[in-house]
Design a protein with these regions (language model features):
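Glycine-/small-residue-enriched transmembrane alpha-helix faces in small-molecule transporters
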Residues: 1-65, 109, 155, 165-192, ...
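C-terminal-most transmembrane helix of multi-pass membrane proteins
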Residues: 2-5, 19-30, 66-69, 162-163, ...
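Transmembrane alpha-helical segments that form core, pore/gating elements
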Residues: 49, 71-75, 130-131, 150, ...
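Hydrophobic/aromatic residues within transmembrane alpha-helices
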Residues: 54, 63, 67, 110, ...
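Hydrophobic transmembrane alpha-helices of multi-pass small-molecule transport proteins
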Residues: 75, 133, 142-164, 179-183, ...
Length: 321
């Protein structure tokens, strides 16, 4: 296993993140990168069906741990590259805790104390938080276009997943917003710092998954105690979450974050509750009524609009997407 070259500078606002230029992988343009990155939140949308149908109840942190730590160790073995220098060891730890170590427990608390639809809608606030953070951390101009479609996307997700009997537990709401804020800050810092030169997306994801998994290890056993027995269906579920929802998804996600505009990537998280709703209809026999279909269309429109530059104003200056 080798160590990565050191990187002393940070990614300049508006510049391509270190080690992530589009021509290097031969994909040729932003659309293939966007489609590959979208696989990540789409696979995260399977988490709800896998959890309810395959995993033992009452152990969401254990599921998060198995989603992160084994995937991180596998990615490290494949990438065979460790951080070099105290700066990147520290950055890998910070990003791992923000993107995974804090996000997963917050999600678990929100899912436990709120109806799934409310929790999903709070998570859909992430594009708005990223748009605000990008102005402070990346020095990007705050775009009314991004904000408007971020609100539209959150509203669309709410129409899809929130039922008339939804309850609003304050602790659950705080946890849901904490999850969105934690991952939004992690996403923004990932874009700010980029990847060190010579480090591929698999190794980069491995650093963060391992750091987040190690953070989750004591938290899980303190909060949930002894792990549950794992039968055949649970084994299938944990393997899916680890290899697909963990390893594959986060490699593609972090790859996209260092090769695409951060606000464009952030809005892709809206795919997660939409995929969950589709699987609920197909696998669990749930129905999507007219209001939900309208919300579905609104959220999809927000995802597409989030990949486009803001319309030019009448005089000719760009909107600054």
């Amino acid at each position: 296993m080798t160590t990565s070259p050191s990187a002393t500078g940070t990614t300049a606002p508006g510049a391509t993140a270190p080690g992530a230029t589009a021509p290097a992988d031969g994909l040729g343009g932003p659309l293939p990168h966007t489609l590959l990155t979208a696989i990540a939140p789409a696979t995260w949308g399977t988490f709800y069906v896998v959890t309810t149908e395959l995993l033992p109840p009452g152990h969401p942190l254990f599921a998060g741990l198995l989603r992160a730590l084994p995937a991180g160790l596998i990615a490290l073995a494949i990438g065979r590259t460790l951080p070099r220098g105290s700066a990147w060891w520290g950055r890998a730890a910070v990003l791992g805790v923000l993107n995974i170590g804090l996000t997963f427990p917050f999600l678990a608390v929100a899912a436990e104390r709120l109806p799934g639809g409310v929790a999903a809608t709070l998570a859909a606030a992430q594009p708005l938080v990223v748009a605000l953070l990008a102005t402070a951390v990346l020095r990007e101009r705050l775009s009314a276009w991004r904000l408007a479609w971020g609100v539209a996307g959150m509203l669309g997700v709410g129409l899809v997943v929130i039922g008339p009997a939804a309850s609003f537990d304050p602790v659950g709401i705080a946890a849901g917003l904490g999850s969105a804020a934690s991952m939004a800050l992690g996403v923004t810092l990932t874009r700010r710092w980029g990847r060190p030169p010579g480090v591929g997306p698999t190794a980069f994801a491995g650093w963060q998954l391992t750091a987040g998994g190690l953070f989750l290890l004591p938290v899980t056993f303190l909060a949930e105690g002894t792990p549950p027995p794992i039968d055949g269906p649970a084994l299938v579920g944990y393997v899916w979450l680890g290899l697909v929802g963990g390893l594959l998804a986060f490699v593609l996600w972090f790859r996209g974050l260092t090769s695409l505009p951060v606000t464009s990537v952030a809005v892709l998280v809206l795919l997660s509750p939409l995929v969950a709703a589709v699987l609920g209809a197909v696998v669990l026999g749930q129905t999507l009524g007219p209001t939900q279909l309208v919300g579905f269309g609104l959220a999809l429109a927000a995802i597409v609009a989030g990949q486009l530059p803001a319309p030019r104003r009448g005089g000719g200056r760009g909107g600054g997407g």
